[in-house]
Amino acid sequence: MLVVNNPAALREQIGQWRREGLTIAFVPTMGNLHQGHLTLVKEAHHHADKVVTSIFVNPMQFDKAEDLANYPRTLEQDCAALETAGVDMVFTPTPEIMYPQGLASHTFVEVPGLSGLLEGALRPGHFRGVSTVVTKLFNLVQPDVACFGQKDYQQLALIRKMVADMAMPIQIVGVPTVRAEDGLALSSRNGYLTTAERALAPELARTMNWIAEQIEAGDHHLPSLVAQASQRLDKAGFRTDAIDIVDAATLEAATDQSEQLVILMAAYLGKARLIDNRVVTLARS
């Protein structure tokens, strides 16, 4: 497995593979890898001859300097896991390589609408940082396919729209959320949980599933469901950040024409901000 940290070396290897007629799948990450990331890598192998990953803690997408400073950096362990998973090349740039003129003067990419909704409203600038770094990584790697987790539902929707709007010749593959046996969605942020908090954490998914069951049973009074779910989480020891039930296609308020809803959950448990989502198909008479 090749590990490179500068764009010239990355492009040289990509160019060689292209000359050999090989296809490339890409999995961008911020490191601190878990089984969910490795599932993305496994999926990537099904779509191309070569698999490239990146490990880059992107300062542009953090709205709090403290979160950026505290984000775990586990490069050595991550590279070992990726090599075992059969990755062909890992790109590990520094912020100075990705943003040589600094963040303030760097050109940015922003997806209108989706960047300011829901999670974007709670974390101003976050999705601008995501779309900018993903665009730059796409330009460097020039993949045929890129794999993203469905756990970050809004991020996946944003990247799909960006790729379509900008006519990027890249197939975006959404990969189902990987869960622990007790239902908790795997996340790098789960590492912030204490033992006691980890035992409570599956309540987020249970509450989400309860909402889904109510909707499937015909309860479409969404504000009431949100209020009950928030109360349930807060009673269990969470601090609810946001629960949104919106049209799964547009991420805007559901209408009579909505065919699917997505339940988007975000809540703090101790220091960790946990997210999850579930899509519900509406029964139409």
Curated annotation (Swiss-Prot):
Q: Which organism is it from?
A: Aeromonas hydrophila subsp. hydrophila (strain ATCC 7966 / DSM 30187 / BCRC 13018 / CCUG 14551 / JCM 1027 / KCTC 2358 / NCIMB 9240 / NCTC 8049)
A GO-annotated cellular component: cytosol
Membrane-spanning parts: none
Please identify the protein, giving its name as recorded.
Pantothenate synthetase
UniProt keyword Nucleotide-binding, yes or no: yes
Which SUPFAM superfamilies does the record cross-reference, listed alphabetically? Nucleotidylyl transferase
Positions bound to beta-alanine: Q61
Which reaction equation describes what this protein catalyses? Answer: (R)-pantoate + beta-alanine + ATP = (R)-pantothenate + AMP + diphosphate + H(+)
> Any one Gene Ontology biological process term?
pantothenate biosynthetic process
Name where it's found: Cytoplasm
Q: Name one GO molecular function term.
A: pantoate-beta-alanine ligase activity
Q: What class of enzyme is it?
A: ligase
